[in-house]
Amino acid sequence: MRVIAVNGSPRKKWNTATLLKNVLEGAESQGAETELIHLYDLNFKGCKSCFSCKTKGSRSYGKCAVKDDLTPILERIEDVDAVILGSPIYLGTVTGEMRSLMERLIFPYLTYTNPIQSLFPKKIHSAFIYTMNIAEEQIEEYGYATLFNTTENYLRLIFGEAESLFGYDTYQFRDYSKVLADRFDEKKKAKRRKEVFPEDCQKAFDMGARFAKNE
């Protein structure tokens, strides 16, 4: 059993990365081999619209033809039993690096046939972990539900199984006194990080363990 987690946050030790690490720890508890990839360490770009992945007879049919730091990551994902993507929400969507990964990861496997099919070689577990500043009850107000549902639907279409995990109302700064952010109540944020974030981490751990047991 092999599990890969991909961190789309520029921060390697904060909310998104912490939840992803808990997923991998859960998988490791069941004997899985794991890997955590930090996208911001890589030099890559999104889809170049070359359509080599869609061209009849192309050596790259069903695969991204672009060669850069992301190429070996995409190749390794083909061999895993579970893939978990994670990103904070920036301006109402995932980070630019995560979006670029998703273009290169999902689009080549997506056929332009009727009906649409997946060229991914097998069915695996997949999930997306989101972290964000807003509270759960604000999801509809900010229009995030559409993003979450669309992403989960694409993951399910390509990989066969998909789910989402959310970290709401996260503690954003190490020291709120140094940042002009008076719309946030630092004490409430700190209380939630102490009381609720550990529950989110447990959910992530349980997800990883469940994936590793192939449940």
Show which residues each predicted segment covers.
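Short, catalytically relevant binding-site loops at active-site mouths
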Residues: 90-92, 134-135, 171
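Cofactor-binding loop segments of dinucleotide-utilizing enzymes, especially the Rossmann-like FAD-
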Residues: 8, 39, 129-131, 167
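Short aromatic-enriched loop/helix-cap "lid" or pocket-rim segments at secondary-structure transitions
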Residues: 47-50, 139-141, 174-179
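Short, glycine-/small-residue-rich phosphate/pyrophosphate-handling segment
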Residues: 96, 109-164
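Beta-strand-loop-alpha "switch" segments that mediate conformational coupling across diverse proteins
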Residues: 163-174
